[in-house]
Amino acid sequence: MSSSKANQTRVCYQPEDTTFIIIASNGPDVMRWRKDKTVPLTEIVDSFQVFTTSNNKGNEGQLITASKQELENTFGTSKDVDVVTKILTDGKIIPHREHGKHKEVN
């Protein structure tokens, strides 16, 4: 399910030093999925891409695609469905906030 940026939610999972992030449609959908796993993942996540941040400091910073090696080392698999399921199940839901909106000062 594709959602507009205004509705996107990050789900962040940090088992050790690296934070892994997926983009979900919105927080209520993630909570609905957590209660009812029969809801298709395609209704919850925008894609099956897993990200980390360029600075490895939580969920802030530029998102970069996590390598297969990072996924294997952390999750024991690089299979996207398994990794996304783990992040959705145990991750922290962070509502999206627009980046780059600046007021011009004269």
From Swiss-Prot:
GO terms for cellular component: cytosol; nucleus. The keyword Hydrolase does not apply. One of its GO terms (biological process) is ribosome biogenesis. Belongs to the SDO1-like family. It comes from Schizosaccharomyces pombe (strain 972 / ATCC 24843). The keyword Manganese does not apply. This is SDO1-like protein C21C3.19. Keywords: Cytoplasm, Nucleus. It is found in: Cytoplasm; Nucleus. Transmembrane segments: none annotated.
